[in-house]
Amino acid sequence: MQHIKLEFENLSEQYSFNYVAQAANGGILYQNGGSVLLASVCTQENEKYDDEFLPLSVQYIEKTYANNKFPSGFIKREGKPSEFEILTSRLIDRTLRPLFPKGYTYITSIVVMVLSYDGKSDLQLNALNAAACALYVSDLPLESLQDKAVSGVRIGRKDGHFIINPTMEQLSESELNLFVSGRDDELLMIEMKSIRTAQGANELSEENFLEALECAKNYIKNATQTYHQQFAPYKKSPFAFESANDELDEQLLNIIQTHYHTPITEAIKHMAKSERHTQLKALIKQVVRECEIEDEKKVQEHIMAYKRKLVREMILQSHIRADGRGLKDVRPISIQTNILPFAHGSVLFTRGQTQALVSATIGGDNDAQNYEMLGSKNALKKRFLFHYNFPSFSVGEASMIGSVGRRELGHGNLAKRALHSSVQEQDKTIRLVSEILESNGSSSMASVCGGSLALCACGIKVESLIAGVAMGLVTQDEQCAILTDISGLEDHDGDMDFKVAGGYKGISAMQMDIKLGGITQEILCQALFQAKEAREQILAIMEEARAKIVLNDVILPKSESFMIPPHKIVEVIGAGGRVIKDIIERFEVSIDLARESGMVSVSASNVENLQKAKTFILQLVSSAGTKKEYEKVDWESYAVGERFVGKIKKIVDFGIFVELPRGGDGLIHISKITKDKTQQLSEIFHNVSELECEILSQNKNKVELGLVE
C-alpha cells in the first residue's frame, strides 16, 4: 500500500495504490477532506466486440451510509440511480471515452463509489479525478495516457473574482458554474451554466468566459503534469493489444471511387438519417453483388470511409456542406406558438429537419419535485423542471418507447441549465417538456429555443429570450473548419460537438464534447464567436415569434401575493394545518406562506376562486379570536334547506359573506341575488345588516347560501 498526498487550490487529495480492488485492472482509493471514493477499472480481455463501438460503461454510485443516512423509501437499500448520479456518470464518460484508441472494443467498466462524504467536497470533481487516476494506472493499453494524465477543475465566480474548485457553500453563492476537464494543454470536455443573481440573469460574456477558461486551462496543465510525475511509478504494464488497422484496401477504394461516387454523393444529400441509411445499405449489397466480394463488412467499412472522406473534403476544400450550406449558415427556422389549446403554453420549433414541440405547465409549491442529495438532511424542492423526450420515430426507427435514458436526462439537464437563470418568477413551479418529433442534429438546442418561447407563451416573465446552437469542427493536418448549426451527418463525421446557449448579453449554458482527444483554446475561441453570430440571428427570428404570441388566458392559472402581519401566519395555518387545508379545499387554490415576511401567495385556476380565498384569509386575520372560532365550527350540523337570519359579515364583488348561526361563514353568490352584473351589491344592501337565508349546499366547510324570498 502506497499513499500520495497532493495539494491544489481548495483540494487536499490523497491517492492510495495497491490497497483496494486489486483484482481490477486498475483500482485506487481517493480521499479529499472527509470524502472517500473508490474508483476501479475492469475490462474483459477475452471478449472483443466486432462492432466499432466502444462498449464502455461508467457508473457513479453514492452510498447513503457515506453521510450517515438510510436510503429513503420503503426498501432500505440503494437502488435506481438518482439524476445526479446519472449526470455525474455521463460527465466522467464524456471525459474519458475519447482517450480509448480506435479498434479497442473490449467490454470495459469504470465504477466510482462514494464511501464517505463530508458535505463540503465537490463530488463530481472528486469522482472524475479518481476515475481518471484509476484508468491512468491500469494496464489498459491507452497510448493517450502514456505521458499525460487527466484532471478536472470547477471554476466559480464571486464579486468579479474567479474561485478555483469552490466548496459547495462557495458554489451556492457563485455567479458561475464552469466544469472543465483536460490533459496538459488540451481540453476534453466543458460544462457551464450561469447562475441568476439579485441583479438578473447574469449571462456570461464571451470575453469573461474565455478568462474563466484560461484560468481552468492553467490549473489543468499544472495538475496533470503533477499527476503524471506522481502516478507514473504505479502504472501497470499494458496488456497486448493490436490497434485497428486504418489502412484501406486501395484496390477496393478505387473501385468505389470510380464506379460508385455518384450514388454515395446522392446518399450524402439525403439529410434524413433513415433515408441515407437505407440508400447506403442497398449500395453495399450492390457492390458485394457486382464486384463478387464475399466480405460484406469490408465493403461497408470502405463505403463509410469514402463517405466520410467526401463529407470532410467538401467542407475543408470547397467550404460547402452536404446540404449545400456555407460554413456559417443556419438552417431555415419556422416557429408556431400555442398550437395546443389546453396546454398553458406550447411552441413548435422547426430548424431544418429537426423539430421540437415544447410545452410549458405552471404549478404551485405542491407541484415541485421533491428530491434528496447525499449531503442534505431534509428533502429539497426543484421548482424548474425540463424533461426531454426522444422517441424512435423522430429518426425513422420502429421501436418501443421505454423509460428515460441517460442521453435524454443529459439533454434535458442542458436545456434546463440554459433557461433557468432567465426566469424572473423563480417562486413558481414550471415544467417544460420537449417532444422531439424529428431529429437531424441539434435537437437539444432546438429544445432550448422552443423552451424559451414556451415560457413566454404561458405568460412567464423572462429576463431575455435564450437561443441555442450546436457548433461542429472538421480538421485535417493544418486545415480546420468550424461549422454552425451542425446536422446529424456532420455530428457523426465531425470532430466536435459544441453546444452554446444564451441571449443577447452573453452565454447562459454550454457543453462541449471532443472526439479528437483534445482541442486548443484558439479553435474554441473562434467557435465561440461564430456561435454568437448564429445565436443573435436565431434570437431575431424568435423575437418576431414572441411578438405574435396570443396567451391562453382562459386556462392560465392566476396568482396574487399580499401581505398580512407575520404573527398572523399561524392563524392561517391553524392547528395541525387544519385551517389552511380547509381553505385550499374550499376554494380550490394553492397557498404559499412566508412566515418571516408575512407574504401570502395564492394561486388558482380562475380569478373568482383566487379572490374568494384572498378575501377569506384577510377576513380570517382581521379580528381577534376568529381562528379559534373557525376551528370549533361543527360544519356537519348545517343541513341543506335550513333557514336562518344571519348577520352580514362582508360584501365583496362576487357575493356576500353571512355569519352562520353556529359559527363560521356562508356565501351568497352574486348570481343568487341579481342577474344584472352592472349592479353593485354594496349599493343594493347599503342599509341592510341582516339577511334571511337558506342553506343550498354544504361540503365540509363550504356552505352555499341563497336568499329567502
From Swiss-Prot:
It catalyses: RNA(n+1) + phosphate = RNA(n) + a ribonucleoside 5'-diphosphate. Pfam families: KH_1 (PF00013), PNPase (PF03726), RNase_PH (PF01138), RNase_PH_C (PF03725), S1 (PF00575). Gene3D superfamilies: GHMP Kinase, N-terminal domain, K Homology domain, type 1, Nucleic acid-binding proteins. One of its GO terms (molecular function) is magnesium ion binding. GO terms for cellular component: cytosol. Mg(2+) binds at D491, D497. Residues 557-617 form the KH domain. Keywords: Cytoplasm, Magnesium, Metal-binding, Nucleotidyltransferase, RNA-binding, Transferase. Its cofactor is Mg(2+). InterPro entries: ExoRNase_PH_dom1, ExoRNase_PH_dom2, ExoRNase_PH_dom2_sf, KH_dom, KH_dom_type_1, KH_dom_type_1_sf, NA-bd_OB-fold, PNPase. Its main location: cytoplasm. Its EC number is 2.7.7.8. Residues 641-709 form the S1 motif domain. It is found in: Cytoplasm. GO terms for biological process: mRNA catabolic process; RNA processing. Involved in mRNA degradation. Catalyzes the phosphorolysis of single-stranded polyribonucleotides processively in the 3'- to 5'-direction. Belongs to the polyribonucleotide nucleotidyltransferase family. NCBIfam families: polynuc_phos (TIGR03591), PRK11824.1 (NF008805). This is Polyribonucleotide nucleotidyltransferase.
